[in-house]
Amino acid sequence: MSVWRAKCEWWLALAALVLLPSLASALTTQSLDSGWQFRLAPSDPHAKTHPRAAQWLPATVPGSAQTALMALKLVPDPYWRTNEPAIQWVGLSNWQYRTHFDVDAVTLARGHVDLVFDGLDTFADVYLNGHKILSADNMFRRWRVPVKSLLHAGANTLEVRLYSPIGRVLSWLLKQPYALPGEFDSPFGDEPRGKQTANYVRKAAYQYGWDWGPRIVTVGIWQDVKLESWDALRLKDFSIAQPVVTADIAKLQAQLELDSDVAGTARVALRWRAPDGSSRTMDHDITLKPGDNAVAIPFEIARPQRWWPVGYGQPNLYDFHVDVTIAGNALAGADRETGLRSIELRRQKDKWGKSFEFVVNGVPIFAKGANVIPMDMFPTRVTPARLARLLESARDANMNMLRIWGGGYYLPDDFYATADRLGLMVWQEFMFGGAIPPANQAFRDNVRVEAIQQVMRLRDHPSIVLWCGNNEVETGWESWDDRKAFKQSITPAQRAQIEQGMRELFDRTLRDVVAKYAPDVPYWPSSPGTDYEGAVNVTDNGDYHYWNVWSGDALQATAYLDVTPRFMTEYGLQSLPAMATIDAFTEPKDRSIDSPVMRAHQKYDRGAHYDESRGNQRLLKYVEREFGKPKGFAALVYLSQAMQAEGIQLAAEHLRASRPESMGSLYWQLDDVWPGITWSGIDWYGRWKMLQYHARRFYAPLLIAALRNKGVTTVSLVSDGTTALPVRWRVRVMDFAGKVLSEHTADATLAPLSGTQVARFTDAQLLDGADPRKSFAVFDLLDGDKMVSRNLVFFDAPKNLALPVPHVDAQLMQEKNGCALTLSSHTLAREVWVSFGDLDARLSDNAIDILPGQHVTVTVHGNASLAALRKALKVQDLATVMAGAPR
């Protein structure tokens, strides 16, 4: 009977295809991104003060009301000087968008037509031809609505009414018995202090203001809009699950989700191309039922060409393609690119507590990298090229992991595809930046749909090695002063409800989504966290955020050497951006550290007003602690970057030398959201600070770490390599003129995947009577005669040393693949910094220590001519800048 029924279903499906030829057509897409207009909602109070914005005006989709108004010159650039207040009204207003589009008879004849919004920001009502079809409330969700019955042949009108996310929530919040603790109070008075609305909205939290960026709460249609039409079948999703991946075999599953109008048999043709160019095809028959169909097709690949993180092998990628046919008619198809690898978050008890290490294809990887924040206040301005440049900069600095911080937004596919190709691992967080979330079920249900959509979208990217529930929600609730005060202000029952809601969200809802839709990737509920095994932000379990340097007690950078967590996911020091960047957002009169403009572009420790930050005084404190009082603003720019780079280097090298006790160093932060004074190593224009060049060296695969703490220098050899390497290491003590006062060389075997301490020296042992103000130690790691790593140790802060002011000779010559710049000095030249103003130029190395008599050649890449480079060339060094000497 079952055989007869199957045959009947097959013939019915075939008959349907024969009788209705349109059923044989695959899904088609019609973009609706063009022709949009926008205006202030007529009833909005701001319409009177901004009458031009109340008229229908051209808008770009994807985009925001803010970017559209900026393009029309109706609001100023908020990044320029102190313009941030002038754009605030936009996020407090309600807006209307509309477009007109044609639909042809072919589309109307299809079995299904859906209107799809890939992203609405955030509260929106959508009307098609006057009919309300959707109410949206989540920036991170895709919205799909069947609309065939509402479409007209010919012209159609689509309208989107967007509501201020602040206004939408605030009136409700003010009526509640309490407001959940958030992040940063608005400096503009649009929210009462302590009454933050961002907690309650599924929207990018950073747009409400952070300690590294302005407050610009966007409103708009921020991703693509389209019509999708199809007939018998829609392929909703296609992915490659990886239950088992070893060197010998990959046991995989092609997973398909199909929406079908017909019952019967369909054929799935799966083909793939391996990284070496070989290919294979397999066919599989499946039985469809009307409605949703989940299909899993197991298959194997012998001796897979596995994906490896950069530095450990090739980031090999397979191309998979699937076609679904019924009776020979191709109805659906899709492509996926993925890498085959196994991921483990290994946590085992050991003598230091409990380990926290990423194991890829069986190899424990020390994570070297930084945190990524949104690259702009306006997400649609971030192009694929900008994303690629940022990731390439990370790769070029020997990083292998980036943490996508949870206060921004889920990044576009281009980001993860580039990370896949570069071999960069991604620590991916769900979008919770630290505020306490609502405890109600409706909120969790909304987040669950968001999480399913995002995990399904991103699960084929081999670069994603962790899904993390949130940033700092758990540690904030546990230990931050404002959270402690809040807990005292509410009833025990209210506290229990909030805590249960957080546990439900981060330990169950999100964990369950990852387990179901991306089971090959580990889940971690909070950063920092211990997976609910006790107190969080501890050094012997889980990951760790360390802010007693810079924030908290404002300890000296050497305090990094006293802390050895299992995995450090945040630590950082601030610096100013390049002078060329500062010039781009200031006038000459603004270029002093305490000017209103420079205060407005510093968001750390901000006061009640947007330009009352005290962060620049903290920055000065750190600079003066090391270098003394800067001789002018340009000197401060240079010295702040040197302070930042050398401090982060101490921490990173300590963590690497502590392997396997510590297995990760992710400093805060890689990039900038705007041109400001922040913790970044790359500023908003993409210019590398000194930190990024230092990172290239302190994250190098082979490292000699010479770390001086309390008068004792500990020497360690570090290797990311997977095989042992015979090496020599050497220490020389010199005076600043280059005279060698003592020298010691030793042979060693550099163990694979290790940090090994090889020596400890007291200051007295190294100096042996030499003047500590006029001497320094040079530690070299040698592979044969090749120096592969070098570190210098000084015996006091630079301001207390008798550093000579060197003459750094710079010779710039044209070569086949760019320009070669040779630098030399007769005396020690520290932190030699080469810049070319605002020219497009990137150096292969910079912020270099040049030993007396040493010649260092670096390559200059870029589009500028040799003549232009020579004219713009500027060379600085630490002693000259500290002395205020002309150059």
Language-model features and meaning:
Residues A26-V116, Q196-D224, E228-L233, Q348-W352, ...:
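Extended carbohydrate-recognition surfaces in non-catalytic/accessory domains of CAZymes
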Residues L32, R39-S43, I87, L92-R234, ...:
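Accessory beta-strand-rich segments of carbohydrate-active enzymes
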Residues M70-V103, L108-F117, D121-L128, L134-D137, ...:
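Active-site-adjacent substrate/metal-binding segments within catalytic domains
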Residues L108-G111, L151-A155, A302-D319, Q765-S775, ...:
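Short glycine/proline/serine/threonine-rich loop/turn segments at secondary-structure transition edges
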Residues S149-T157, Q255-K349:
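Extended acidic/polar, glycine-enriched regions
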Residues S164-L170, I326-L331, L782-S789, M882:
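Short acidic/polar inter-strand loop motif in beta-rich domains
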Residues L256, P596-D845, I850-H861, L866:
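Carbohydrate-binding surfaces of carbohydrate-active enzymes
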Residues M401-R421, M425-Q602, M643, G647, ...:
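Substrate-binding/catalytic cleft of secreted carbohydrate-active enzymes
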